[in-house]
Every structure is written in structure tokens, then in C-alpha cells.
């Protein structure tokens, strides 16, 4: 097991970071967030580069790469807060490809891989999901139940009610399948990969929040010295770093597991999402506080990271749910009854 990127993976990371630095500037993110629109030109450009289908099999028009490469893009897009439907569409494609029938894959994956179609994925109870990010812009929606079963339906088959989530960089809706669509033969097969993707995006969000905070406390002065020189501030920044790196390590391990040891993915993905959800909530909240009064203003860009972090932390279950999942897996392995 080697967590170091290959030369090709480092090139994907470098290219993505450089491109997004110029295309997903804070001003552009703010413009689309305030209008609650996706950045259609940027989405088209990313699709032309093959990003939309980076982990989709070549037979369906994708790049045929793995979860590690997909996670690299998720992290960079999370760092940039790019207002594009990459994450929900990638998660939907993952669940369809790894759990769907050949007919379902043939129907939906070519469009998702090319970016011509947009996907969305949400956690549902009895066919209804209260929050599905990207659903208003989607052509295909995947609803995953708590027992791991899943249903795929065309957007026009679903009952959609657009809602405003905490994160205005993303569209969202409540969705009801109302018995429409088609059951996936194995809904659990791709769910672990979807969890890894959202965990990786949270790593990017936390890393950016940490970077912005450290830069701010080095420049902001009080009593004639940078506030970052005060022990309470430096210790809080150190804690933010620890939480971010824990999320990064578990997400990296889960991405590697998805490609190299998929039998262990359920456990690794739950670990990644639990750590990333904790970090997403704590690191972005700390970033707001460490920016002081300016952190609470609309003009400060740090609040966009807070909103993305809080939303992603809840997607497909928060830290508590995934810790319970880890406990159940370990109890089953030991032959003991799970708690709760």
C-alpha cells in the first residue's frame, strides 16, 4: 500500500488546481452562489476535459480511471468551491456503474460520462429524500435507502420540490420516487465509493479553510503583534490541522481500498466519512471564529467554506451514523451482537 501519488495522478492534481485557480475564483463563486446557478461554461469545460467521466468505464465513454483519480478531482473542486454539479453527478454515476444492470449502465452512463447529462444522489426513506443536492439540474436521480437498496429514475419521473439549502453554491430539492424508476440489483456496491467522494471533497474544503485562517492570523495584528502568535490561536490552528489531516488520511485509505481491496471498502468508507464529517463541521466553524468579527460578514469568503462543510458533513449520513456502521461491521466480524 502506497499513499504517494503516481506521476499521472500528481499531474491530474496540478492541472486541476491550476485550472480552478483561474476559473473558479472567489468572485466567480460568489456570483453564482448569490444567483444560485451552476457555472455552465465551467461545467462544459470540465466535461470537455473528461472530468465528468474520469472514473466511468471506457466502454461507457469514460476515462476508465479509479477512485483515487476521482477523489483527487473531488478534493480540488471542494477546495475551489466550484459551482458545478461534479460531486452529485459523479456519485450517481458510481452507484449506477457498480450496482446497476448492463441495461441501466448503457442508458445512463454515456451521458453522465460526457457531462451532457447530470446526475444526483440522495439518501431516502421509503422512496423519499428530504435533500438531494443537484436534483433541480439533474436528468437522472439515484435514491439510496438505509438498507442499501437503491432506485434509479429519470428526473421527470420524480416528484421534485426545489429547496434552498445552507450552501447556495448548489441547487437542491426534496425528491419522491413515488414508485417510479428501476431498482438497482446491488445498491450497496457503489455507495462506498460515493462516500469516499464526498469525504474527499470535505478534505479540500477543510484544507482551504485552514489555509485561509492561517494566512489571516499571520496578518491580523492586535497589541502590536500577529494574533497567530497567541497560544490560544496557534493551538486552535494546530487542532484544525490535526482534524484536516485525519480526514485526509482516512479518505486516502478509503480511495485506495476502493481500487485495491474493495471487500474492505464498506468499513474504510465509513471511517472516512465519519472523520471527514467531524472535520467539515469543526474546521470550518473554527475558521469563522478565528477570523473574528469579519468572519461573520457576507463579504468574507470564509463563510462559503463553512456552508459547504456543514452541508457535506450531513450528506449520506453524518459522523454518528457512520461510527454506528463501523461498530456493526466490527461486531459482525467478531461474531458479537451490534449495539443499538
Whereabouts are the PLM-identified features?
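FAD-binding core of flavoproteins
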Residues: 82, 94, 102-215, 225, ...
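Helix-loop "lid/cap" segments that line or gate small-molecule binding pockets
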Residues: 91-100, 328
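Alpha-helical interface subdomain recognition
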Residues: 1-80, 115, 192-340
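Short, flexible active-site-proximal loops enriched in glycine and acidic residues
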Residues: 80-88
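A short linear-motif detector with a strong N-terminal bias
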Residues: 31-33, 74-75, 97-101, 121-123, ...
